């Protein structure tokens, strides 16, 4: 695959891609199976130190919908979060007619990244049922990943949102040392 992004300054970037899809099954078991397959595949190609970072689109999306901001403002917040500019997010939310609890959840987003314990903290601060359900699904996936023996390779990041509305459920990215980008991306 050849990709020509504007950030590549006119140079083409060649990459090799492998795809896997599980079609027709919308279950936590299917999500866990796909992530376990990623872990197994990375181990089989010889990687020993890597992390698969998992999030759920519904967590952040439900927060966005609750802000009352316009689509353009929401898109700006998504971009700020993708660039880890949480101060910019706070500034934009000052303009929003959002509850103090919702603003606090946005402020805590950087803390909702890490091991499984962040999910327990996130569910306590989730201001919507949709956000709570997203965290609950991630907890179920984690328990299944433990059965696969893949839990040591998994972290969570509830600020992950996928790209341009393409994903509607879990999203994941795998990282290892020596690369600046994710070596695996995917989701539902």
Feature-to-residue mapping (PLM):
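Positively charged, Gly/Ser-enriched RNA/tRNA-binding surfaces
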Residues: 1-48, 92-188
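Short, conserved phosphate-binding/catalytic loop or strand-edge motifs used
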Residues: 13-18, 54-62
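Short secondary-structure capping/junction motifs at helix and strand boundaries
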Residues: 46-52, 72-75
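Active-site-adjacent beta-strand anchor residues
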Residues: 53-54, 157
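Short, solvent-exposed helix-helix connector turns and helix-capping sites enriched
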Residues: 56, 84-85, 115
């Amino acid at each position: 695959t050849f990709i020509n992004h504007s950030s590549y300054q006119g140079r083409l970037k060649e990459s090799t891609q492998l795809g896997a899809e599980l079609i027709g099954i919308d279950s936590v078991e299917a999500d866990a199976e796909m992530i376990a397959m990623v872990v197994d595949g990375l181990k089989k190609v010889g990687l020993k130190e890597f992390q698969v970072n998992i999030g759920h689109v519904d967590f952040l999306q439900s927060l966005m919908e609750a802000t009352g901001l316009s689509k353009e403002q929401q898109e700006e917040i998504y971009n700020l979060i993708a660039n880890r500019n949480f101060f910019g997010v706070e500034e934009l939310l000052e303009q929003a007619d959002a509850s103090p609890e919702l603003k606090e959840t946005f402020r805590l987003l950087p803390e909702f990244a890490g091991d499984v314990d962040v999910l327990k903290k996130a569910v306590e601060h989730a201001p919507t049922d949709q956000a709570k359900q997203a965290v609950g699904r991630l907890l179920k996936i984690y328990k299944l990943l433990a059965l696969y023996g893949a839990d040591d390779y998994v972290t969570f990041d509830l600020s992950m949102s996928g790209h341009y509305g393409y994903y509607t459920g879990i999203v994941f990215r795998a990282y290892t040392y020596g690369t600046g980008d994710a070596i695996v991306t995917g989701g539902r």
